[in-house]
């Protein structure tokens, strides 16, 4: 790949494109004209002149093109902060926005076309593999999917030119709607379409109207079934927190259209615009900052080949009319005082050859005080370490509210400087080398937390099996976990059972004992505080209901929701009706009657952990009893189905009932849910019967036994203790998740599977003080895992800097780690010739990179900037060599005083 590193290498036609800094621009470029190179150079050029990477947005049509663009950018910009730059297609941006801005539920999944087909195939009781393998059937499914998007856009009032799949509303569909409107005496308009869509099955009888033309009747049936399955698809995605690729666009458009607080971008470039559809272009318009934007469109009329995906050649015509902006670049610095910015700008202009007019300005005209800008020469490398440490201590002592960073060029320097600070008892935080969160030991701790929150987490179990040294490689660990899944087993079976499994245990009880299937309806989802307002149960033996069911309604002082999401809560009216008739039981009476009904039987529920634990806490409040003190074991039909049918899209009760054509209704009334769960339990038993023999054979296999024994020895004690305590609230004030991480660390350290983590306390403090801060989240491990674990999984060591939890006000950091951070005081360590630029550099590119590194280091300062260097160095043979201040400082040295 060709590498271009300065603006002079661009030809005359490219320079205006790269230098464009304001307005709307359209670049039409045939293949081979260096379009990708220009896109990359624009990134480097703009960033060197003050545009932050996180204010830039680089969009293209395909993921492949995005990867090529990013690779080219990386070839000309050697900068760790480049990770802040967004490069991707429009869908990628929308996905990133929706998830990072918490615009969708945390557990939302992005489904592809085949998964979308699978959802509809489930409703139609068809084989998804058969559909995918049949072009015509697959096309029909696509039309249903596209139609659901068309309805969404119609419902939300999108302009017609932004509709993604207007073609899915065919002429035949229009004929059908018109006929239904005639029969129902409705006006033919968009609202009529939406009305028919919402009630598609109710209008099927219209297709059987007397004297109706059979062709028109077929059109009506086709449309109404298409509408029905499209609505099923919409509802399924909503209930299961799923988005398809088109949803990413539609949701982002609606949010940006309505919410002015969404981040707008002052600098955008878009490649292959001829391939964008109207909705994508509309989203880009919404992303653009209104004040003085820089938007660069690049495309080629000769390569517009994606009309089947909604792209229109008219897009370029629109852009030709729009793109008439002037070329200029306005920036304003809101951080640095003028005396610092003068240094940065002179350095950028004279050392990095940046046009002064394109460099930032500031309104902060505070004058420099004596000692704010210093050059610190030391006699030797050894004394430089001491001098810099002493200066950091002085700044720490004299300015109790300020932060100080010593920025070094290598990890070795960071280590030596850290030792020098330790010798003078200066507390500091060192950020260099491998990130703490990337180490195997911390990953093992994270995996432990993940499986406590979700025992079906494949990757985390793999890490535990490898990290605890049960297997020598991740590959072997993955194979082992995959084998368990095929056998309807979980690694938890090996830790919670001696010679059995969850499935086998359930089946034995199902065949030989009575089971009480139960469900609760509650005032909310907080198992520690909410009340049970309905509790229902049925007793079964061998799947047959024995005796009478139990259905109790209970008084509460807490409010009952009228709606469950967008659906009316059927219990609301029923509850208040019983309240008015005086038919509600006191919590004490109802709970005691339930216990009497239960006796010593085994409990079973769907998602039983919720029902069991809210029951336990209600018993504690009202009867002073606990389920944990009783002999009743409990099983979960949801867990059983996840083990027995591991690849379903949903394990909600209603989905399972429909998927397996089971008798029962999921109505959000406990008694109905119990009846439905009984049907599901029978299915679980049927499926379990075919799994137990294989499980037993696996557990008894001579090659498996040693691994199971090793696994238990390495992890069982820790897991069982934490697993059993997930629903216990921590009363001592310490965060439950923090306590669990501590316990895991102590355990793994004692077992000898990890080395000591010197900086673990930083992680624990950060979690306690900066992350686990929502008072609405109960201090119980299960609740904190569900609420916080996704964010915790993205942490980096540099997140600690300037956080509330960090106690140190002095930092030692490499240049790369300092990117994106700011400090009151900055000391650049050993800015000598031979370091800046490095004496081992072999090209001008390397020298220029070192100049940029020095600029980055200096520009972290908000108040004081000190440049330190050693005037002599010692080689490995003991020879002394004179050194000078880096020549990069020649043009700005006049601003600095020199210490003596």
Could you say what each language-model-derived stretch is?
Residues 223-226, 454-516, 524, 539-540, ...:
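Accessory C-terminal helicase-associated subdomains
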Residues 1-107, 264, 345, 818, ...:
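P-loop NTPase Walker
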Residues 513-516, 523-623, 628, 650, ...:
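Conserved non-catalytic scaffold segment of RNase H-like nuclease domains
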Residues 683, 801-809, 832-900:
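C-terminal accessory regions
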Residues 55-175, 317, 633, 655-658:
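Conserved P-loop NTPase-based nucleic-acid remodeling module centered on helicase motor cores
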Residues 3-19, 23-31, 116, 211, ...:
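Conserved helicase NTPase motor core
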Residues 26-39, 43, 324-326, 333-426, ...:
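Helicase P-loop NTPase motor core
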Residues 2, 45, 278-370, 375, ...:
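Conserved RecA-like helicase ATPase core segment
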């Amino acid at each position: 790949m060709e590498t271009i590193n300065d603006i002079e290498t661009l030809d005359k036609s490219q320079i205006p494109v790269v230098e464009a800094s304001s307005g709307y621009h359209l670049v039409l470029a045939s293949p081979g004209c260096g379009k990708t190179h220009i896109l990359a150079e624009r990134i480097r050029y703009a960033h060197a002149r003050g545009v932050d990477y996180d204010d830039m947005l680089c969009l293209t049509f395909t993921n492949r093109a995005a990867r090529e663009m990013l690779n080219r950018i990386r070839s000309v910009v050697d900068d760790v902060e480049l990770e802040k730059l967004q490069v991707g297609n429009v869908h990628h941006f929308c996905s990133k926005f929706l998830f990072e801005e918490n615009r969708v539920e945390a557990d939302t999944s992005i489904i592809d076309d085949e998964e979308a087909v699978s959802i509809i195939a489930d409703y139609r009781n068809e084989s998804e593999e058969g559909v995918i393998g049949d072009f015509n059937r697959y096309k029909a499914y696509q039309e249903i999917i596209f139609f659901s998007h068309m309805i969404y856009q119609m419902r939300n009032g999108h302009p017609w030119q932004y509709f993604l799949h207007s073609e899915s509303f065919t002429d035949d569909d229009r004929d059908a709607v018109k006929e239904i409107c005639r029969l129902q005496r409705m006006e033919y308009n968009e609202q009529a379409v939406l009305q028919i869509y919402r009630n598609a099955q109710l209008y099927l009888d219209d297709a059987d109207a007397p004297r109706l033309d059979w062709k028109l009747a077929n059109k009506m049936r086709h449309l109404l079934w298409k509408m029905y399955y499209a609505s099923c698809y919409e509802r399924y995605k909503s209930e299961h927190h799923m988005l398809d690729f088109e949803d990413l666009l539609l949701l982002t458009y609606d949010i940006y259209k309505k919410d002015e607080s969404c981040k707008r971008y002052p600098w955008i470039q878009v490649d292959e615009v001829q391939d964008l559809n109207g909705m994508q272009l509309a989203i880009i318009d919404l992303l653009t900052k209104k004040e003085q934007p820089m938007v660069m469109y690049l495309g080629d009329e000769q390569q517009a080949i994606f009309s089947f995906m909604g792209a229109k050649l008219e897009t370029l015509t629109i852009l030709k009319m729009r793109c008439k902006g002037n070329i200029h670049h306005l920036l304003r610095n809101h951080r640095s005082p003028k005396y610092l910015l003068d240094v940065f700008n002179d350095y950028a202009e004279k050392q990095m050859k940046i046009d002064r007019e394109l460099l930032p300005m500031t309104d902060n005209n505070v004058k420099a005080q004596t000692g704010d800008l210093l050059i610190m020469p030391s006699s030797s490398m050894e004394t430089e370490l001491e001098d810099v440490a002493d200066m950091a201590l002085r700044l720490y002592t004299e300015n109790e509210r300020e932060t100080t960073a010593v920025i070094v060029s290598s990890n070795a320097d960071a280590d030596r400087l850290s030792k020098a600070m330790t010798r003078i008892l200066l507390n500091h935080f060192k950020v260099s080398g491998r990130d703490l969160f990337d180490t195997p030991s911390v990953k093992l701790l994270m995996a432990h937390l993940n499986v406590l929150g979700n025992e079906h987490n494949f990757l985390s179990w793999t890490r535990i099996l490898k990290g605890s040294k049960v297997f020598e490689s991740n590959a072997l660990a993955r194979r082992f976990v995959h084998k368990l899944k095929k056998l309807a087993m979980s690694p938890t079976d090996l830790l919670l059972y001696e010679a059995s499994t969850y499935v086998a245990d359930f089946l034995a009880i199902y065949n030989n004992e009575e089971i009480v299937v139960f469900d609760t309806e509650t005032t909310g989802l907080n198992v520690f505080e909410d009340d049970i307002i309905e509790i229902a149960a049925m007793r079964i033996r061998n799947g047959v209901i024995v005796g009478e069911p139990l259905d109790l309604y209970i008084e509460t002082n807490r409010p009952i929701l009228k709606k469950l999401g967008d659906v009316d809560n059927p219990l609301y009216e029923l509850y208040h009706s019983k309240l008015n008739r005086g038919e509600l039981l006191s919590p004490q009476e109802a709970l005691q009657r339930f216990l009497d009904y239960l006796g010593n039987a085994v409990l079973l529920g769907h998602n039983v952990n919720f029902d069991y634990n809210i029951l336990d806490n209600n018993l504690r409040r009202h009867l002073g009893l606990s389920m944990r003190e009783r002999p009743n074991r409990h099983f979960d039909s949801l867990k059983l189905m996840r083990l027995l049918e591991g690849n379903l899209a949903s394990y909600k009760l209603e989905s399972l009932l429909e998927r397996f054509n089971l008798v029962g209704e999921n109505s959000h009334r406990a008694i109905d849910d119990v009846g439905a769960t009984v049907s599901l339990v029978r299915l679980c038993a049927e499926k379990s019967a075919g799994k137990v023999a294989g499980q037993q054979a696996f557990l008894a296999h001579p090659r498996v036994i040693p691994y199971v024994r090793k696994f238990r020895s390495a992890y069982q004690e820790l897991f069982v203790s934490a697993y059993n305590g997930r629903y216990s609230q921590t009363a001592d004030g310490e965060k439950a998740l923090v306590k669990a991480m501590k316990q895991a660390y102590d355990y793994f350290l004692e077992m000898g599977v990890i080395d000591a983590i010197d900086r673990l306390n930083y992680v624990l403090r950060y979690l306690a003080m900066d992350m686990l801060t929502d008072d609405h989240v109960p201090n119980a491990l299960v609740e904190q895992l569900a609420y916080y674990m996704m964010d915790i999984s993205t942490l980096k060591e540099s997140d600690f800097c300037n956080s509330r939890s960090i106690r140190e006000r002095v930092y030692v950091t490499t240049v790369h780690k300092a990117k994106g951070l700011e400090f009151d005081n900055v000391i650049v360590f050993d800015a000598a010739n031979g370091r800046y630029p490095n004496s081992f550099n072999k090209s001008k590119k390397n020298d220029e990179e070192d100049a940029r590194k020095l600029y980055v280091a200096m520009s972290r300062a908000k108040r004081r900037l000190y440049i330190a260097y050693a005037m002599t160095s010692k080689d490995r043979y003991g020879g002394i060599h004179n050194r000078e201040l880096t020549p990069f400082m020649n043009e700005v040295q006049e601003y600095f005083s020199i210490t003596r």
